[in-house]
């Protein structure tokens, strides 16, 4: 059997869109066949039927009404499918044989612009990634076709670089060079939910000069070769899917990776910049606190500012000064916010115009928005800060476009472009004449109705209209006998009435319908002319939209600063950050007002380079560390900060290692993920970076974890190429020994108060290390049953005693084995231990194994815990440690523990 002509046409079209679900237009429906039908029926919950296609088996089929297609398309795209829209491209009335059909658009997650599915305050990005494998370089191009943003960059071909940019832009779709390393492709796939397509190298490299010149003109000439190739693939993909060149994409913003603060994927999540960790929603994020913008454009711009903090001091200062000016003039800023409030999303209206799907209501929204600009410009006319002065100078009031739309488009136009009722009276003479003819015709119909009622005496007689029969005279059957013979021609019989026509009625009908059809067609053509004229000024409109968005951000930051008691930070590049009474802007927003406990911070490249923070869980260590990072980031987007005073040193990167999470899909345990994150930090941080490390080493055994944490601290502080500012929270109290041993390490802890065997977290960061972890008390606060709490205390006491006894037993063995070594060291006796008692076990300590110490002075008080040296510091350091032991301050148990540690250290040096 042979395929039917229509199915042959279907397969010919489908052959070019194998990766899409093909919506095949048949009359008033989009039909899907074969595998597409099965997929669509499953995903959209449609009834799967069949259709004769010329094969032995019927073709699986399902369909949707074309007028309701948007919701179905949106659901498929949201699930990661591509949808190819195949339309009838000729009028079936004039078709000879099968109606011509062709795909007019391919809708994908990255190119879908329907306002019902694209969030107003988020960009809908699509990204291409190209690589020169020989030179180990990569380039990325990113666009949002709904706004016209088009960005590009290049850098080293490193996984971290690519994943950081993906996490920053969060694209809905990514087009990859298919020769990229398979491990990198796997990492990208695991990092993002974006729809990923792979293209051959030719897609990136062929015809790039021609393609880019057609899209951007001479602006593309200055681009680097790498950027040209990634941009080429992106422009091609837009042309392949949209089937037209989008005029709102008319410029490329090339940025350098060093122009903005680097924040990796893990840090973006941990700091909850734009969404919270739990629900992945905006509420509870920094953006939630900061975003009180008046426009969708401003909200998207603010999101981008948060994702891309500045690192240039001068640019940061420009924003801060502009925010300060509006902050200091409440009345001015209130007026500005009010003026911005009624401005619609100009960027996305321009996207619709560029994509040829803007209707008359979109143009009215554009006109309304343009009409607000003179007021906005007037409000900031006398501003003195450089940024606001520049906005005023460059803000185009677009008066010519406003005047065109004001005199041409009706205030409440039809939603459907081909139904007329779009153009104002007086704009076009021919339209006015056709409307007059249409109005006169309706008057004539009304006159005819009255005349026939009088002639027949039938008061219920009426003249009606429908699209099938046109105009008719309707008379009820009850009055049928009153109809004069031969006056009317019967047209239709109803249950309770008869419908008639007359030659005169059909004549006026022809004139009326002709005028209506011609009027609708003429209005449509004139509307397209007006829309095209607006499109000719898309450069000016885009520039104005960007200024409005930035102005909205500045005004918003001033408003939020006033609302939340933020202050203007000072900014420096000398490496020291000082924060007085700093607060976490999100946490203080979600707890009762006035309950947040502020904290000070001093961190620099010298004596306060690495802050070791100890204290119990739930005491506020993680909140404190995050707040330092967020205050720094807020400053670098140009925002005021939650503190009473702040002097922030510009950082180039923020890294965080906070929280625990498995990477099951990637085959990595919690500890492996933690080590990977630490490795990434140590490799990529610089002396100008800010690093937050929380509980490094907790995912393994105690001594392994302690060893790793200790070594990481040493590496950060002693590596001349690193020495980054670091906040290091830990439960390893042994690490507090490093203050004084390693330059730059300082101990801090979270204050805790004990009242009647209960603990109270004071949330205050104080100098000095914590003396215990309070883990059982935290468990009690969390609601663990008393029976479990009491048993935990018993077990803890037992473990502590066993641990102490084991240490003493080991000490005895080590000391007996090393007696001669100790005596040869010429160490004099300074303290004698007679005996000690551990529960029921009595352990006698002989005089010959008593610890001896040198006569050197005591420098500092010693911690009462074992000092474990994992770095083999050498004989000089051992002698120094011995000289610093204050034997008189130690009890017998502590003395033995101390002796054991020193002997073990001495043996390692042999």
Swiss-Prot record:
<dbReference type="InterPro" id="IPR005748">
    <property type="entry name" value="DNA_mismatch_repair_MutS"/>
</dbReference>
<dbReference type="GO" id="GO:0005829">
    <property type="term" value="C:cytosol"/>
</dbReference>
<feature type="binding site">
    <location>
        <begin position="615"/>
        <end position="622"/>
    </location>
    <ligand>
        <name>ATP</name>
    </ligand>
</feature>
<dbReference type="InterPro" id="IPR007861">
    <property type="entry name" value="DNA_mismatch_repair_MutS_clamp"/>
</dbReference>
<keyword id="KW-0234">DNA repair</keyword>
<dbReference type="Pfam" id="PF05188">
    <property type="entry name" value="MutS_II"/>
</dbReference>
<dbReference type="InterPro" id="IPR036678">
    <property type="entry name" value="MutS_con_dom_sf"/>
</dbReference>
<keyword id="KW-0067">ATP-binding</keyword>
<keyword id="KW-0547">Nucleotide-binding</keyword>
<comment type="function">
    <text>This protein is involved in the repair of mismatches in DNA. It is possible that it carries out the mismatch recognition step. This protein has a weak ATPase activity.</text>
</comment>
<dbReference type="InterPro" id="IPR016151">
    <property type="entry name" value="DNA_mismatch_repair_MutS_N"/>
</dbReference>
<protein>
    <recommendedName>
        <fullName>DNA mismatch repair protein MutS</fullName>
    </recommendedName>
</protein>
<dbReference type="Pfam" id="PF05192">
    <property type="entry name" value="MutS_III"/>
</dbReference>
<dbReference type="GO" id="GO:0140664">
    <property type="term" value="F:ATP-dependent DNA damage sensor activity"/>
</dbReference>
<dbReference type="InterPro" id="IPR027417">
    <property type="entry name" value="P-loop_NTPase"/>
</dbReference>
<dbReference type="InterPro" id="IPR036187">
    <property type="entry name" value="DNA_mismatch_repair_MutS_sf"/>
</dbReference>
<dbReference type="Pfam" id="PF00488">
    <property type="entry name" value="MutS_V"/>
</dbReference>
<dbReference type="GO" id="GO:0006298">
    <property type="term" value="P:mismatch repair"/>
</dbReference>
<dbReference type="InterPro" id="IPR045076">
    <property type="entry name" value="MutS"/>
</dbReference>
<dbReference type="GO" id="GO:0030983">
    <property type="term" value="F:mismatched DNA binding"/>
</dbReference>
<dbReference type="InterPro" id="IPR007695">
    <property type="entry name" value="DNA_mismatch_repair_MutS-lik_N"/>
</dbReference>
<dbReference type="GO" id="GO:0005524">
    <property type="term" value="F:ATP binding"/>
</dbReference>
<keyword id="KW-0227">DNA damage</keyword>
<dbReference type="GO" id="GO:0003684">
    <property type="term" value="F:damaged DNA binding"/>
</dbReference>
<keyword id="KW-0238">DNA-binding</keyword>
<dbReference type="Pfam" id="PF05190">
    <property type="entry name" value="MutS_IV"/>
</dbReference>
<dbReference type="InterPro" id="IPR000432">
    <property type="entry name" value="DNA_mismatch_repair_MutS_C"/>
</dbReference>
<dbReference type="InterPro" id="IPR017261">
    <property type="entry name" value="DNA_mismatch_repair_MutS/MSH"/>
</dbReference>
<comment type="similarity">
    <text>Belongs to the DNA mismatch repair MutS family.</text>
</comment>
<dbReference type="InterPro" id="IPR007696">
    <property type="entry name" value="DNA_mismatch_repair_MutS_core"/>
</dbReference>
<dbReference type="Pfam" id="PF01624">
    <property type="entry name" value="MutS_I"/>
</dbReference>
<dbReference type="InterPro" id="IPR007860">
    <property type="entry name" value="DNA_mmatch_repair_MutS_con_dom"/>
</dbReference>
């Amino acid at each position: 059997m042979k395929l039917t002509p229509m199915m042959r046409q279907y397969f010919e079209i489908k052959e070019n869109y194998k990766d899409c679900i093909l919506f095949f237009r048949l009359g008033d429906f989009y039909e899907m066949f074969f595998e597409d039908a099965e997929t669509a029926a499953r995903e959209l919950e449609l009834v799967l039927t069949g259709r004769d296609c010329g094969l032995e088996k019927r073709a699986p089929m399902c369909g949707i009404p074309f007028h309701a297609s948007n919701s179905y398309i949106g659901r498929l795209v949201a699930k990661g499918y591509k949808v190819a829209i195949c339309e009838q491209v000729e009028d079936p009335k004039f078709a000879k044989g099968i109606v011509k059909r062709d795909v007019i658009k391919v809708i994908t997650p990255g190119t879908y612009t329907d306002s019902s599915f694209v969030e107003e305050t988020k960009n809908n990005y699509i990204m291409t990634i190209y690589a020169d494998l020989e030179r180990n370089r990569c380039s990325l191009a990113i666009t949002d076709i709904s706004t016209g943003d088009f960005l590009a960059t290049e850098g080293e071909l490193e996984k971290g670089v690519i994943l950081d940019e993906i996490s920053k832009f969060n694209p809905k779709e990514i087009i990859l060079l298919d020769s990229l390393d398979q491990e990198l492709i796997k990492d990208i796939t695991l990092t993002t939910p974006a729809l990923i397509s792979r293209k051959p190298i030719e897609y990136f490299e062929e015809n790039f000069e021609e393609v880019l010149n057609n899209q951007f003109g001479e602006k593309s000439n200055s681009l680097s070769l790498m950027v040209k190739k990634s941009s080429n693939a992106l422009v091609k993909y837009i042309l392949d899917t949209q089937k037209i060149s989008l005029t709102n994409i008319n410029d490329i913003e090339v940025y350098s990776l060093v122009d903005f603060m680097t924040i990796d994927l893990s840090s973006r999540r941990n700091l909850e910049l734009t969404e919270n960790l739990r629900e992945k929603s905006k509420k509870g994020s920094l953006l939630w606190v900061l975003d009180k913008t008046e426009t969708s454009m401003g909200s998207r711009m603010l999101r981008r500012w948060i994702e891309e903090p500045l690192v240039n001091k001068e640019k940061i200062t420009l924003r801060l000064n502009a925010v300060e000016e509006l902050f200091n003039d409440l009345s001015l800023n209130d007026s500005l916010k009010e003026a911005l409030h009624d401005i619609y999303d100009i960027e996305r209206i321009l996207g619709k115009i560029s994509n040829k799907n803007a209707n008359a209501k979109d143009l009215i929204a554009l006109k309304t928005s343009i009409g607000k600009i003179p007021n906005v410009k007037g409000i900031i006319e006398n501003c003195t800060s450089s940024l606001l002065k520049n906005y005023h100078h460059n803000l185009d009031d677009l008066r010519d476009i406003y005047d065109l739309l004001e005199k041409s488009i009706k205030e409440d136009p039809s939603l459907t472009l081909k139904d007329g009722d779009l153009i104002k009276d007086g704009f076009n003479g021919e339209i006015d004449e056709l409307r007059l003819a249409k109005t006169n015709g309706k008057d004539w119909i009304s006159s005819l109705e009255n005349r026939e009622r009088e002639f027949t005496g039938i008061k219920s007689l009426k003249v009606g209209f429908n699209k099938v029969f046109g105009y008719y005279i309707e008379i009820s059957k009850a009055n049928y006998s009153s109809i004069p013979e031969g006056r009317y021609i019967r047209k239709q019989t109803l249950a309770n009435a008869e419908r008639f026509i007359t030659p005169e009625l059909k004549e006026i009908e022809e004139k009326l319908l002709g005028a209506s059809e011609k009027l609708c067609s003429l209005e449509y053509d004139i509307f397209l002319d007006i829309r095209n004229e607006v499109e000719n000024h898309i450069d000016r409109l885009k520039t104005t939209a960007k200024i409005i968005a930035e102005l909205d951000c500045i005004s918003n930051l001033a408003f939020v600063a006033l609302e939340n008691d933020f202050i203007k930070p000072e900014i420096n590049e000398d490496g020291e950050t000082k924060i007085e009474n700093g607060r976490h802007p999100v946490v203080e927003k979600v707890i009762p007002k006035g309950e947040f406990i502020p904290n000070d911070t001093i961190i620099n490249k010298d004596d306060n380079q690495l802050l070791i923070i100890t204290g119990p869980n739930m005491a506020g260590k993680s909140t404190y560390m995050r707040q330092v990072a967020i205050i720094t980031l807020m400053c670098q987007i140009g925002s005021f900060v939650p503190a009473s005073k702040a002097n922030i040193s510009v950082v180039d990167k923020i890294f965080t290692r906070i929280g625990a999470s498995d990477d099951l899909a990637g085959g990595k345990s919690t500890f492996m993920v933690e080590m990977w994150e630490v490795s990434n930090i140590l490799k990529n941080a610089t002396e100008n970076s800010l690093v937050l490390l929380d509980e490094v080493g907790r995912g393994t055994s105690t001594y392994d974890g302690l060893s790793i944490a200790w070594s990481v601290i040493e590496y950060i502080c002693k590596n001349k190429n690193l020495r980054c500012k670091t906040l290091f929270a830990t439960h390893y109290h042994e690490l507090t020994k490093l203050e004084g041993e390693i330059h730059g390490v300082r101990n801090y802890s979270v204050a805790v108060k004990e009242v009647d065997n209960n603990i109270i977290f004071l949330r205050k960061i104080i100098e000095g290390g914590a003396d215990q972890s309070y883990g059982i008390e935290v468990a009690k606060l969390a609601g663990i049953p008393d029976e479990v709490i009491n048993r935990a205390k018993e077990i803890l006491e037992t473990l502590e005693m066993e641990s102490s006894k084991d240490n003493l037993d080991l000490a005895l063995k080590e000391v007996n084995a090393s007696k001669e070594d100790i005596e040869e060291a010429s160490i004099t006796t300074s303290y004698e231990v007679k005996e000690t008692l551990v529960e029921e076990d009595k352990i006698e300590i002989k005089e010959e194994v008593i610890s001896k110490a040198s006569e050197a002075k005591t420098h500092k008080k010693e911690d009462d815990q074992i000092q474990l040296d994992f770095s083999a510091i050498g004989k000089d350091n051992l002698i120094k440690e011995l000289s610093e032991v204050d034997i008189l301050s130690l009890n017998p148990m502590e003395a033995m523990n101390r002796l054991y540690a020193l002997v073990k250290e001495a043996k390692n040096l042999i």
